[in-house]
Amino acid sequence: MGANDERSKEIFEVMSVPKALAAMAIPTVISQLIMLIYNMADTFYVGRTNNPYMVAGAALILPIFNVCIAVANIAGAGGGTLIARLLGADESQNARRVGSFSIWFSVFCGLFFAVLTGIFMRPLLMLLGASEQTFEFARQYATCVIVVGATPTIASMTMSNLLRNVGLSKQAGFAISMGGVINIILDPLFMFVLLPPGREILGAGIATALSNVITCTYLLVTILRLNNPVLHFSLRDGMPSAAHLASFFGVGVPAALGPFLFDLDYIVLDRLMAAHSDIALAAIGIVLKVERLPLNIGIGLCLGMVPLAAYNYSAGNLPRMQAVLHAARTAGIAISVGSIALYELFAPFLIRVFIGDAATVALGTDFLRIRVLATIMMFLSFIYVHYFQALGQGKTALFLVVMRWLMINIPMLFLMDRLFGMYGLAWSQLVSDVMVAFLSWLIYRRAMRRIHESGVVLCGGCGVRLRGAVSGFVIANSYNV
């Protein structure tokens, strides 16, 4: 066993829970923050052209790019959490099969999606709303980011997820952070130095594609150099079993669906706010960017928690599994409270960073101070979804995702808008997240009570034969592998 493998085993089994969580979560949080800065910087650089058609052309590609993220989530979250559970159950050979399958699944999906996009570029862009003025800009950007960049993007996100789920969070976080920093550096270089005026959107696309290729190459070399017993590129060990494939997609699909519904919620909010005034739309648009900071930190914390919870669940170490959730939940609540305090105090300054118009600043300040109150409940709803993903409970995670966005958040937007207008739209996030967090907690409590009362770990569909004992109970697996 190599030094990295021993270190991973120490993190999963021996290291104190707060220290283990920090080792897993801090690199992930840093990479999340760098990607947040990159996304803002990309928008900033394209906006510097003062060409609305160029800005619109780049924005049109977002739904296509989100498909790449969804595919990466299927392979990364579905495969990654399954690998962590298999390692906890001491099934390293099955974990190897899932690891290689996840990587090649991401590569083939990326190639397939890139070819489809290239073939059907014009009808796809027109379907998304491209006009004669924006089509060429959108085509240039999509060619670089999707046709050239889809495969390395999906593969990079998948490999970083897999690395984190075998305990190598530092390497995964460094790779994603490196890609974001390279992109931030290359954007102005290609947009304003190397390419002539009028080609800025092409420069942004080249910078994004190149940074993703570099990140993917780095991750490939890292996995080969580490010689990890689980992560490899050979398919000679065979395919995962039917049960493991069911778990792969059972957890991966809900993880992929979440970002789509998240974006749908934002679209509905924008449309409803636009009906009130352009200033209100501008204000909420800025708020949605500013509020991403604690959200991305919370997601990074959840992603760091998942491998620890998954491993100890299958290892039969329920006390440590519960301690991981408690530590992550406590840290997330503390960060949320700090974020609320900072945003309440400095809301006007934060809005002025993006715009100087007094009316927009005033409205944006109000909206930010209202929406940030939901931070704690939003984090709690996120952490329970990730927790059920870690346990292989894909159906429960899917139920919570659908309930959150389709059954509660989006209907609440329409209701609060009708009752209280644009300020009702701002308050809807808090109202919805209180309901979602309470529902998530009830389902979590029910699942834990069933485990302790029956002595059976509810692993139906998790694709893993569990080992060990839980608090004196014998573990049984309801899924026949």
Question: Which residues fall in each region the model found?
Answer:
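Short alpha-helical transmembrane segments in multi-pass integral membrane proteins
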Residues: M1-A25, I83-G149, P196-V253, A309-A374, ...
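N-terminal transmembrane alpha-helices
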Residues: E13-F44, R48-T49, P63-G78, L82, ...
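Transmembrane helical elements of multi-pass membrane transporters/channels
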Residues: A23-D42, C144, G179, S211-T215, ...
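Helix-terminus/linker motif at the lipid-water interface of multi-pass membrane proteins
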Residues: I37-V55, L125-E132, L189-R199, F260-L293, ...
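Interfacial/gating helices of multi-pass transporter permease domains
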Residues: V46-N66, E132-R139, I201-G203, A243-V251, ...
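Small-residue-rich hydrophobic transmembrane alpha-helices
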Residues: V55-V115, T153-G167, Q171-A172, A283-A341, ...
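Hydrophobic transmembrane alpha-helices of multi-pass small-molecule transporters
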Residues: V67-A70, A114, N183-P188, C216-L220, ...
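Short runs within selected transmembrane alpha-helices of multi-pass transporters and secretion channels
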Residues: G76, V145-R164, A172-G180, A204-L219, ...
